Regions:
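Short, positively charged, Gly/Tyr-enriched micro-motifs
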Residues: 24-72
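Single, function-defining residue in the core of a domain
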Residues: 1-42, 80-81, 94-96, 107, ...
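Hydrophobic, Leu/Ile/Phe/Ala-enriched alpha-helical segments that form helix-helix packing faces
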Residues: 52, 87, 149-153
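Active-site-proximal, Lys/Arg-enriched surface segment
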Residues: 62-122
Length: 379
């Protein structure tokens, strides 16, 4: 049996059980795309196609993939929602962090905006949308996605806190979070004007000395909008080694804990790294149509979920299992990388057990792997 067929068999039973469709080929070809992504560690269609165990020309295999990516009968959210329902079935008492961020693909033609769930000091995809062009995005572009996520998540978790960077600093984002019943922690620019409860108004960076933490309660944000919020401020070191202010607005009490919570947002940047050079090379996709990118992300998301699931499996087996793929005496690989390397070693050597995909994750909290001191905020 080919290694690709091994992976197919381990994905097949659970995905067909969760996503029943009349046309079985929709799921069959979906699984082959997932297999190709895992095998090739790439989102390039020719490389995905090269991993499919079919005695056909390369062009035919790529055509099969393209047809699935363009198939309007493949409903991305209904397919993926069924999987997420299974993944989150035991999370009803959990307060979760959702992380909103964007990444450019195909140069600057497309932006993928993704809501991800913090898991094991990384993040797994929950929902995404593709927007043409670059630059800051307005709240109306992503509102329907966030409302969809809210309707889904409220059935499976206790409370949601949304973390976002300064690309989402407009007051509209914070206001939408409150409408959705979510807490929020959003980074703002250091030159933002705030008005204190006593009526004093000035730029935020004029209030906070370098390398000092400050916490402001019940301030009004910006000169125009006057959003009432709380602000937590700390400092980190930028790429040039200079002090850089980190200011976070939140509906909760401004305090040190808010800064620690926001540090969780780094998980999504590292997870996009898993999608790109550290894993599946998403940035180099040459797809030019939003629908095809949307479908590709459906395959990539299942690949990511399985890697997280395998990472959990390895940690549950103990240090002896981790040391088979992680050469350090302490963990230096993310949950995603542990899972991906275990999968690759199984396919290469056949020496270790590879469990079937179960679409099951625990509310795992892990300490981060080693991070250079220069990247750590003063929290």
């Amino acid at each position: 049996m080919s290694s690709s067929q091994e992976l197919y068999n381990r994905l097949n039973e659970k995905l067909r059980e969760m996503v029943p469709v009349k046309n079985r080929k929709q799921v069959t070809n979906w699984i082959w795309v997932i297999v190709g992504i895992l095998q090739s560690e790439s989102c390039n269609l020719s490389q995905i196609g090269n991993c499919l165990p079919m005695d056909t020309k390369a062009e035919s295999r790529v055509t099969l993939i393209r047809r699935w990516l363009s198939n309007s009968q493949v409903k991305v959210w209904p397919f993926y929602k069924k999987v997420l329902e299974h993944v989150l079935s035991g999370w009803s008492s959990v307060e979760v962090y959702l992380i909103l961020d964007g990444v450019m693909v195909f140069g600057d033609r497309w932006q993928i905006f993704r809501v991800s769930l913090c898991h094991g000091c990384r993040a797994i995809p929950i929902a995404w949308t593709i927007v043409e062009g670059n630059g800051l995005v307005k709240v109306n572009k992503l509102k329907s996605m966030l409302e969809k996520v809210q309707r889904f998540m409220k059935r499976y978790v206790k409370q949601v806190s949304l973390l976002a960077d300064a690309g989402f600093r407009d007051c509209d984002w914070a206001q939408l979070c409150r409408e959705l019943g979510w807490n929020y922690a959003i980074r703002i620019a250091c030159n933002t004007y705030i008005t204190l409860p006593d009526g004093t108004s000035d730029r935020l960076d004029n209030w906070v000395p370098v390398n000092c933490n400050r916490y402001f309660q019940n301030v009004l944000l910006t000169r125009e909008t006057k959003l009432q919020t709380n602000v937590s401020v700390t400092w980190t070191i930028d790429e040039k080694g200079q002090p850089e202010m980190v200011a976070i607005i939140t509906n909760q009490i401004a305090c040190r804990a808010r800064l620690r919570e926001y540090a969780t947002r780094m998980s999504i940047e590292q997870s996009f790294g898993d999608d790109k050079s550290g894993g599946f090379d998403l940035a180099h996709t040459r797809l030019q149509h939003a629908q095809r990118i949307d479908h590709l992300l459906l395959g990539l998301s299942i690949a990511t979920l399985w890697c997280h699931e395998l990472g959990e499996f390895i940690l549950k087996q103990g240090e002896s299992a981790r040391c088979l793929i992680d050469p350090s005496h302490e963990r230096t690989l993310s949950l995603f990388q542990l899972g991906l390397r275990w999968l690759k070693r199984f396919l290469t050597t056949g020496l270790h057990f590879l469990p079937d995909f179960q679409a099951c994750l625990s509310n795992l909290r892990l300490k981060p792997v080693v991070i250079p001191i220069s990247q750590k905020p003063n929290v």
